[in-house]
Curated annotation (Swiss-Prot):
Native organism taxonomy: Viruses, Varidnaviria, Bamfordvirae, Nucleocytoviricota, Pokkesviricetes
Family according to the record: Belongs to the glutaredoxin family.
InterPro entries: GLR_AS, GLRX1, Glutaredoxin, Glutaredoxin_euk/vir, Glutaredoxin_subgr, Thioredoxin-like_sf
Localization: Virion
Tagged with keyword Disulfide bond: yes
Disulfide bonding pattern of the chain: C23-C26
Glutaredoxin domain ranges (all copies): 3-106
Biological role stated in the UniProt entry: Displays thioltransferase and dehydroascorbate reductase activities.
Protein name: Glutaredoxin-1
Biological source species: Variola virus (isolate Human/India/Ind3/1967) (VARV)
Upregulation: Expressed in the intermediate phase of the viral replicative cycle.
Amino acid sequence: MAEEFVQQRLTNNKVTIFVKFTCPFCRNALDILNKFSFKRGAYEIVDIKEFKPENKLHDYFEQITGGRTVPRIFFGKTSIGGYSDLLEIDNMDALGDILSSIGVLRTC
């Protein structure tokens, strides 16, 4: 059930972030991603409160990413980790290039 909930949201050419809106790390990750202009349908924010029981979702995240916490961020079907991983990529000024390379950003 958790696998289906996650996997049906992960597609190539899309950024998917699983969050709890009450989580400060999730809000910080959203702030970073919201600096970019995504193509329609290329960015999805998933509130994990939609899934019950939530602990099963955390178990599945740990199984596929090595981490149980949110945010869990995926570029396509590949997990890039959580907030600290996203922040590190952003601090290296590489995030825009990565997002461009997977085809999720709008072009003028």
